[in-house]
Amino acid sequence: MSLILFACVVRVRDGLPLSASTDFYHSQDFLECRRRLKTLALRLAQYPGRGSAEGCDFSIHFSSSRDVACMAICSLQCPAAMAFCFLETLWWEFTASYDTTCVGLASRPYAFLEFDNVIQKVKWHFNYVSSTQMDSSLGKIQEELKFQPPVVLTLEDTDVANGVMNGHTLMHLEPAPSFRMEPVTALGILSLILNIMCAALNLIRGIHLAEHSLQVAHEEIGNILAFLIPFVACIFQCYLYLFYSPARTMKVVLMLLFICLGNVYLHGLRNLWQILFHIGVAFLSSHQILTRQLQDKQSDCGV
């Protein structure tokens, strides 16, 4: 019997299944384990990155990072280090194939079902390739598990009904680890300073124009909004650079669009060089946001 029986990839924040292996095991115990895995997937955000839920015949292992988690049903004979090495390899394969925007925009279950081909390939590798060929990878995972043991549950702990777990009110455990970004660069700091300066200029001009327009006419409302909307967009660009946010690329494009349209609308109140300066800063900030990635270690568990 295989050590790794089933695997799936889910979105952490809501447990949406993104892909899964098309395995056909019809034993009652296995189907019950599948049901509990689905329940556990809905609560992954409550647990740290790695965890295991053990039952009488099968065990569930999960490993999550960013907004993607990989889960597996294994036989009890499967070593924990092998299971987590498998999950980490699967995670890297998935994130290399689909970016965070695709994952964040997924709206239906199994939107990436074609990834099953990769799951089967990785699963076959870990089930049938000699463990001596993976000694370095397994040894590294074993060391990590010693220093940071996974959360250990029972399969009964995963059964939740109406907010009650095993007769007790469901308590939220510590949240998933916060996302750590790459260090801020000198060019990134410059983009922040310029963005704050542009935001301040937009706010000052917008407030000044609003005070004047209240006494004169309502035709200036468009100009006021053309100052204030880019002000908000500049501040949000600073936030996107400093902190991780899902669907970051889409948000960056929207903020850049707001700033560009606002400045083009203000061509009568700003000269060409002022407009080019504001748009140039917006492009610089957008570039810095998209090039600053999450800090994460590379996996040694190759296929």
Curated annotation (Swiss-Prot):
Keywords: Endoplasmic reticulum, ER-Golgi transport, Membrane, Protein transport, Transmembrane, Transmembrane helix, Transport. One of its GO terms (cellular component) is endoplasmic reticulum membrane. One of its GO terms (biological process) is protein transport. Residues 205-223, 270 are lumenal. SUPFAM superfamilies: SNARE-like. Residues 8-119 form the Longin domain. InterPro entries: Longin-like_dom_sf (IPR011012), Longin_dom (IPR010908), Sec22a/c (IPR043546). It is a multi-pass membrane protein. Gene3D superfamilies: Longin domain (3.30.450.50). Pfam families: Longin. Residues 1-183, 245-248, 292-303 are cytoplasmic. It is found in: Endoplasmic reticulum membrane. It comes from the Eukaryota. The chain crosses the membrane at residues 184-204, 224-244, 249-269, 271-291. May be involved in vesicle transport between the ER and the Golgi complex. Belongs to the synaptobrevin family. PANTHER family: LONGIN DOMAIN-CONTAINING PROTEIN (PTHR46258), VESICLE-TRAFFICKING PROTEIN SEC22C (PTHR46258:SF2). This is Vesicle-trafficking protein SEC22c. It comes from Bos taurus (Bovine).
